């Protein structure tokens, strides 16, 4: 927020959620505390980046502070809200490379091609594999959020919410899945002279990271080879072995 202030230490801002200070290591397996918050649960989002940040939180706020306040219950009858969306992601461009037939003709007509190279490209006649299409996809993602809020008589406002996010990446097998749940109670006692805030949040995140090296491999891999062949060594998938066996 305030610009990098250290060459070796973290330059991440301090994140405060409902008065609780969160750091990148405060939740095991969660690199960014912001991903633990359902966006539909956020009431306000405040950024502090001047001297007031360090005055309140000390040296921990040297990189600025992000203060998040989540929604609370309101007095009145029960109200239920639902929101959802579906999004579609696709690659913007495709790198133009040779087809299997073009590459096969290029090798056959190359005076410097060896007999082994010509044999390799003719191993699967007519095969034209577009490896970019094999590793990329049009990704469909969904998000659903439902919440209920109200109060028990006038002294116990409450809010309960549940959210589900399933985000697919354009690289096959990449996926982000998140379940969030929260309960907020804000009871009032002694004619509103005593107010309490009770918050409980739960989150389950499942990340599946795809091998980004597959993008480079898809551009450079031999288009004359099929995705699958009759070799069961590698689950039926074609692959070059360490001895460069063109039979995979």
Language-model segments: residues:
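Short acidic-hydrophobic sequence patches enriched in Asp/Glu that either
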Residues: 37, 60, 74, 175-177, ...
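Short acidic/polar hinge/loop motifs at secondary-structure boundaries
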Residues: 18-49
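Short alpha-helical linear motifs
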Residues: 102-108, 184-186, 200, 219-224
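Surface-exposed extracellular loop regions of Gram-negative outer-membrane beta-barrel proteins
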Residues: 37-53, 142-210
């Amino acid at each position: 927020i305030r610009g990098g202030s250290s060459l070796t230490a973290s330059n991440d801002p301090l994140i405060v959620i409902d008065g609780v200070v969160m750091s990148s290591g405060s939740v095991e397996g969660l690199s960014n505390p912001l991903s633990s918050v359902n966006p539909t649960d956020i009431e306000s989002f405040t950024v502090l980046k001047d001297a007031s940040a360090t005055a309140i939180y000390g040296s921990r706020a040297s990189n600025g502070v992000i203060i998040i306040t989540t929604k609370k219950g309101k007095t009145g009858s029960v109200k239920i809200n639902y929101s959802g969306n579906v999004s579609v992601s696709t690659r913007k461009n495709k790198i133009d490379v040779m087809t299997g037939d073009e590459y096969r003709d290029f090798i056959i007509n190359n005076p410097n091609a060896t007999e082994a190279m010509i044999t390799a490209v003719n191993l699967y006649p007519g095969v034209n594999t577009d490896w970019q299409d094999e590793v990329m996809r049009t990704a469909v993602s969904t998000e659903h959020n439902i919440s209920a809020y109200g109060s028990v008589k006038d002294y116990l406002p409450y809010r309960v919410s549940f959210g589900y996010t399933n985000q697919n990446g354009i690289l096959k097998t990449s996926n982000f899945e998140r379940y969030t749940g929260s309960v907020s109670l804000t009871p009032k006692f002694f004619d509103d002279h005593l107010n309490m805030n009770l918050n409980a949040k739960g989150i389950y995140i499942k990340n599946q990271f795809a091998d980004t090296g597959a993008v480079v491999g898809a551009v450079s891999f031999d288009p004359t080879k099929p995705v699958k062949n009759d070799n069961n060594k590698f689950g039926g998938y074609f692959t070059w072995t360490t001895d460069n066996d063109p039979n995979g």
